[in-house]
């Protein structure tokens, strides 16, 4: 192990694996280590017995739930936007050849006490039961504006500069009501709070366009895709990619201790008495706990069920977003469901997650609005985990630390962190203008 590397990556979570893959493709000499004997870190996938051990402290799950190996339960389940930056990143690295994707059946929102399909096009707005007849017309006009908006063509701007006009001002022009603003902001543009209303509308409009483009791309009923066998496939695919480019992976390396010189700059990592030298470190918060601070907690429920989530048109894979205002909360709640159709559970079984930024110490009570939507469950587990963000200055110590995974059930915030870290590490922007047909496996 006594070798020199440009970058040592610690932890095989999704963010670390994507960065390791991107750097390898750039020709950077990478050593990738993990203290665990499995891939994925906090974002790993568990079989049924592992799930049981983690949440019940028992070695074996009851037999009536089916074979343990037929379960691939992602600890950080997140759907990918079909046209989004993560899919583009996967294509950029050519890691898609190791993965198979399948479209997600449904995209829903909880508004006015009901689970409803998210309309994202003028046609869908007119059919939606979310709105009354006049609101449908107003929303249809707004969606048409968004659909036709082209940054480079002023004729489509309707006399507005969206880098100056706020989202609130743009929406006011179309006279949309509070519930419509809620589902557009949180279930189409995928904002996690309401700050976007006072920010330039350009970002929200581009997010809405991404949703509609992703929806059109797979001619599906949702804009999302998900790998067969779950997200646990991603870290392993990146490990294979890294090996192709000469990167080295080492699992089960205890006490990966980061070493610094007198000036506080990183010089290497020691494990089992051997030190590998490096110029830069990329890691998750658990490897450098004195360079991060706690920023909150996520409450989550994981359920095993024998039916789809009610009121989702029998969707075998689905996301339901509950905007914060609908529950008088400060943060949105997310419901995620996947099943045997994505090979994450045995035939007839569904895995559901409910997650949110914790505002109390009681996940069971706090998550009730989400767990109530699930219908009867075979089993349910509740837990909470802390979230951390880096407080170090990477230009001084050469340590690049990811932020803990948030409560969202889509990848938009995760990939934003990855791309920002990539720019900090390399000093360049990642070019994501790729041929999207390379991920067409999802259309099967």
UniProtKB/Swiss-Prot annotation:
InterPro entries: FAD/NAD-bd_sf, GDP_dissociation_inhibitor, RabGDI. SUPFAM superfamilies: FAD/NAD(P)-binding domain. It comes from the Eukaryota. GO terms for cellular component: apoplast; cytosol; plasmodesma. Expressed in roots and floral buds. GO terms for biological process: protein transport; small GTPase-mediated signal transduction. Keywords: GTPase activation. Coiled coil: none annotated. One of its GO terms (molecular function) is GTPase activator activity. Belongs to the Rab GDI family. Regulates the GDP/GTP exchange reaction of most RAB proteins by inhibiting the dissociation of GDP from them, and the subsequent binding of GTP. This is Guanosine nucleotide diphosphate dissociation inhibitor 2.
């Amino acid at each position: 192990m006594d070798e020199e590397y440009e970058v040592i990556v610690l932890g095989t979570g999704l963010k670390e694996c994507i960065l390791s893959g991107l750097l390898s493709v750039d020709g950077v000499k990478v050593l990738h280590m993990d203290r665990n004997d499995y891939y994925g870190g906090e974002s790993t996938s568990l079989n049924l017995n592992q799930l049981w051990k983690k949440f019940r402290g028992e070695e074996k799950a009851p037999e009536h739930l089916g074979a343990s190996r037929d379960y691939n339960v992602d600890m950080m389940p997140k759907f990918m936007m079909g046209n989004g930056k993560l899919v583009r990143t996967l294509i950029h690295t050519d890691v898609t050849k190791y993965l198979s994707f399948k479209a997600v059946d449904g995209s829903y929102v909880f508004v006015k006490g009901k689970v409803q399909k998210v309309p994202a096009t003028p046609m869908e707005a007119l059919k939606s039961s979310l709105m009354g007849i006049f609101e449908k017309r107003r929303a249809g006009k707004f969606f048409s504006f968004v659909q036709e908006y082209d940054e480079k063509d002023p004729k489509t701007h309707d006399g507005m500069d969206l880098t100056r006009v706020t989202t609130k001002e743009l929406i006011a022009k179309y006279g949309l009501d509070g519930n419509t603003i809620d589902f557009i902001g949180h279930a189409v543009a995928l904002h996690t709070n309401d700050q976007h209303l006072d920010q330039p509308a350009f970002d929200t409009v581009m997010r809405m366009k991404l949703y509609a483009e992703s929806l059109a791309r797979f001619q599906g009923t949702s804009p999302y895709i998900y790998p067969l066998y779950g997200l646990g496939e991603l870290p392993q695919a990146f490990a294979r990619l890294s090996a192709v480019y000469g990167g080295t992976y080492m699992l089960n390396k205890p006490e990966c201790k980061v070493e610094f010189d007198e000036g506080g700059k990183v010089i290497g990592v020691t494990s089992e008495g051997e030190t590998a030298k490096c110029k830069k470190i990329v890691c998750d918060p658990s490897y450098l706990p004195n360079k991060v601070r706690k920023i909150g907690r996520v409450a989550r429920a994981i359920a095993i069920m024998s039916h789809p989530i009610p009121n989702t048109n029998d969707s075998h894979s689905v996301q339901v977003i509950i905007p914060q205002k609908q529950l008088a909360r400060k943060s949105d709640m997310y419901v995620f469901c996947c099943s045997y159709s994505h090979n994450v559970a045995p035939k007839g079984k569904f895995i559901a997650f409910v997650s949110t930024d914790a505002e109390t110490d009681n996940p069971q009570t706090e998550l009730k609005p989400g767990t109530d939507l699930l219908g009867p469950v075979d089993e349910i587990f509740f837990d909470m985990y802390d979230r951390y963000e880096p407080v170090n200055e990477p230009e001084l110590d050469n340590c690049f630390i990811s932020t803990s995974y948030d409560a969202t059930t889509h990848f938009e915030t995760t990939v934003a962190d990855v791309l920002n870290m990539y720019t900090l590490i390399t000093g360049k922007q990642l070019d994501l203008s790729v041929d999207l047909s390379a991920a067409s496996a999802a259309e099967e």
